[in-house]
Amino acid sequence: MKRLILAVVALVAFVDAKAQLSLEEYRTSVMEYSWLLKMRNSQSEEARENVGRAKTGFLPSLSTNGSFGLQFRDVKGVRRWDFSLQPQIIQTLYAGGAVRAAVKTAEMDYDIALCNEAFAMLDVGYAAEHTYWTLSAMEQYLASVRRYVDIIRSLKQLVDARFAEGYIAKGDVLQIDSRLSEALYELSVAEQNYSVAKNNFNILRGVDLATEVQLSQSISDSIPLPARVEFDNVVASRPDFAAADLACGRAEVAVRAARAPYNPQLSVGVGGRWAPYTPNKTGQTEVNGSLFAQVSVPIFHWGERHRVVAAARERQRQSTLALQQLYDDILREEMNGWVNLVDSSAQVEASMRSMVIAGENLEISTYAYNEGVASVLDVLQAQISWLQLYTNTITAQYNYAVAVSDYQRITARPSRY
């Protein structure tokens, strides 16, 4: 029997542990459900297919042209119908650099799409962590308000008893009733905020809104302060910066692509023709073949080439400027993220100390009121101070947890908790 009880206890503990959801598990489920990541992955696949399509420009092409005609007037000795079928195989030898530019552009587009997909993973991961910590904060805030309501109710019982015994005036009873009404209103708001946070939590991972949630991690857990990352390493790790750098290279290739149509073009091919003899007197057909070379040399287009290439170079310059702007943005983002992280860590320590003091003050005030040496106003003021500092602590812990997640997103580093 003892073994059976131990087995049941172990099973219950196992089921309870399995029901809890860790931050890593939630982040994984959000990424698996994310429509944004699915779209980015589809865009990467599209870009990969475009690379294969661009490379077909190096290969010969096979095409055929056909026609059929029927004359309305009858010519003596000549049949009224006629047809022609002309297959051709053409190999482009030189397209002015257009084919190589198209392949290079497609390859860079594929790399850019992969970078965009990686950057979207950072954003989705941060959104998951932000939502997780928000729900944790709303849980703690709801618990603190419930505790606050319990404290006021216990004080109300004491006040009502002392009023019934004639030790205090009616004003004290009215004050505690008013404070209880305010606390119940705060409880209603806290429950609403928790419900909204839970709905957002479930929507982000694609489950039913009524699904109950039990978090295995909390903002009150000890989250280590991450080490600051060297800025050069931050830039080297950012997928969006890599994409912007690739965009500069793509713009350089686009200059060559813009120039290509104005360069000489050379292609060779072999073709055939199946058609009736001309004139078509007997309806008999013949098959003939030919080898050919096609050359196109643009000569004068009123400065069109110069303007097209100049416009492409301006777009290249814009890409370079955008890269420099992104560099400054990442620098600002990293500096502000680190300052916010350090400040929020200090705020957690300060708020924890203040909350301990407020808790001791509440105990002393309640004890003094029970002994008749303090007024109910002193107790109510201590309760308000305790709730405010408790809320400040929750806010500070939430801000710190979010700041850690944000800094890891900024530096493109995986979460370590």
Language-model regions: role of each:
Residues A120-V235, G337-N340, S344, W386, ...:
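Periplasmic alpha-helical coiled-coil/stalk elements that build and connect Gram-negative outer-membrane
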Residues F83-I89, G289-V295:
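Hydrophobic, lipid-facing positions within transmembrane beta-strands of outer-membrane proteins
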